[in-house]
Amino acid sequence: MQFSYSWLKTQADTELSADKLEHLLTMSGLEVEEAETAAPAFTGVVIAEVKSVEKHPDADRLNVTQVDAGTGELVQIVCGAPNVKAGIKVPCSLPGAVLLGNFKIKLTKMRGVVSNGMLCSTDELGLPDDGVNGLHILPQDAPVGTNIREYLDLDDTVFTLKITPNRADCLSIKGIAREVSALTGCAFKQPAIHAAPIAGSRKQPVQIDAPADCGRFISRVIENVNARAATPDWMKQRLERSGIRSISALVDIGNYVMLEIGQPMHVFDADKLSGSLHIRRAREGETLECLNEKTVSLSENTLVVADEKGVLSLAGLMGGAASAVSDDTQNIVLEAAWFAPEIIAGKSRQYGFGSDSSFRFERGVDYRLQADAIERATELVLQICGGAAGEMVEAQGELPEAKQVELRLGRLKTVLGVDIPAEQVKTILQHLGLQPEKTAEGFRVTAPSFRFDIEIEADLIEEIGRVYGYENIPDDYTSGRLKMLALPETRRPRFAVYNEMAARGYREVVSYAFVDEQWEHDFAANANPIRLQNPLAAQYAVMRSTLIGGLVEILQNNLNRKQNRVRVFEIARVFSKGSDDRFVQNERIGGLWYGAAMPEQWGEKTRNADFYDIKADVENLLKNKAVEFVKTEHPALHPGRAANIVSDGQVIGFVGELHPKWLQKYDLPQAPLVFEIDMAAVLEREKTRYQAVSKFQPVRRDLAFVMPETMTHDDLLAALNGAANKLVQEISVFDVYRGTGLPEGMKSMAVKVILQDMENTLTDETVEPVIGKLIDAATAAGAQLRS
């Protein structure tokens, strides 16, 4: 929000210096990004009237002028501007003046003719371009001899504020003045709104077909206007110092009212409209050529203003070229509306352009301001362009309901740490336009129509704090009781997981939750992902249901930077659709390993990491849980090198090698290994229980079984563990053999069996029956003891 201090003072009767106001606004939460004078520093420039002009005797492009600069006698100045002529009033720098760049004016000769100064253009004074090739021509009533800085108020300060999205009420002079009044106690002088005399007969019918999107729409026809009328200099100056270029009187008036009171407006050429105005959603196939000369194809989630023939404007964003006013316009329709922020939000990104109107509408405009805006704009149109105003036509849809918020003085003291008297609290609320009602514990406030951000008690506490002044709150130590939350033995601390991954050589990464829809198809086989209504970009159109896509992208970035060994992990949320189309978000940990199993060294041959390397990392991560790995198929993973991670019969994640078909698509020289696990399962751990250590020696038996290639080691171990009794402490595979001596399609798998008793030394008589049951179980499962 950019504005001049002089304009602000018309509504806030403050005598603060510009520096003090800058500090006050910033400390109250309205950050001042920039504060500078309306024009760069220069001295010695006055208003002069050109009395006569003669051609230079020795230069075709120069003129010799006699000017009255208020010195009591005419001053001769040589001038080369093409628009110099007798009778005009212009800025004049006399000898001793200092212009931009420390350019000093002194008496000089130009082609033999004495020149006692210089007549100036806007460029030479650092003023906004007036579109004139030559001297800056001033109004005829400009007083000769007056300092130009004083006449044009060039020492005025122009403020640029960084308004946060919740403070749309401060996107106008009226809103800023209200704030200054609350902060300083100065008088708040609201712009006077006068009902226009009704002299015209035409009305513009209005119909709201989307009442949830448009709460109010007001139109007024003004007939017989002079569209060629010049915008007054005072209005031009205020617009220019607010960063808005003057276009034409009718357009300037709409912009002026928006800046003055905060209501965006639009002006239609009434003779280019057909029938009633309809506020509705766009229809399939509709297009619009906008005022910026861009033609856009409209989506059905876009609100438009249309007549009987078609779309006239993008509601709250930009008008259409076909219904725009021009120098030939004779009759106009003024529009002031309230559009729901939700329907305007994101449209600037969607269509690739925005406007001052959309900037305000998507943040929220006062829904009681529209009639005042029409009356104010009408007053200015009649004053500048003439015409006859007709009656206002108003249509109403669904408007927001005013919210009531309770403020407890005790809570205010607890949060701010300072005891502010109730009467002072009441005064602050009144100055902010929040009419307070006394209650037993404090005040009840009904949020005004211009404050969408007042919803809960904390909002009121913030308002009191910033107006009271954060600098006025004493630097006392706050005290309070902190209760430590007990961490049960069955839960690991989160930092332990991060430390565990770092200890295994993984680096933490963070990726976007918004991902490319193709990733969801490739890595999760998700044909119906959660789509964003207003994505930041096409490649961030959906919410992720897996972390794999982000990890693969990070791998690509590292490979592009010549990193040939990458191990990364991420702990983040993934999103999916639950029952009744509700969204579910779960936290997961994902990891990726690419490249060599070990860093290059002399003591170990280089080999690429494989499934068992990353499986070992997963086992280490889940060492406090009993888990098993079950062969599976997953859209992201190699068909023969993928496993589900199962705990207590529930699948808690997966691990494996990336599918070969994705290597070429994602430009990967070799396959990375990945895993993804529910974070809740990772944080769980089984309670540690005491287990006595046997003082008797263990007994080991090695068994080799011949089995079909289709039989997995999990099948064998499941059969053996099912037949084991309490003497069996461990069963594990230690060798697999294929080749000579075995029938085709068969393999040999050797297992070790560790037996131990807590009370006795084991004998063959005790061990052999146990081993026999294990052999029988393996035989029943399809494996034969190898002889």
What are these regions (language model features)?
Residues 1-200, 333, 352, 356, ...:
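Phosphate-backbone binding interfaces of nucleic-acid-interacting proteins
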Residues 2, 431-434, 582-584, 598-787:
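A carboxyl-terminal module marker
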Residues 4-5, 23, 63, 184, ...:
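Glycine/proline-enriched, intrinsically flexible loops and inter-domain linkers
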Residues 39-43, 195-198, 482-483, 487, ...:
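Beta-rich nucleic-acid/ligand-interaction surfaces
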Residues 47-76, 236-237, 254-322:
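Conserved mixed alpha/beta core segments that line enzyme active sites in large multi-domain catalysts
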Residues 111-126, 130-137, 148-153, 157, ...:
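Mobile "lid/hinge" segments at catalytic clefts and subdomain interfaces of large enzymes
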Residues 175, 405-565, 569, 701, ...:
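Extended, well-folded interaction surfaces typified by the phenylalanyl-tRNA synthetase beta subunit core
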Residues 180, 184-209, 385-412, 418-419:
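Terminal amphipathic helices with adjacent charged low-complexity linkers/tails
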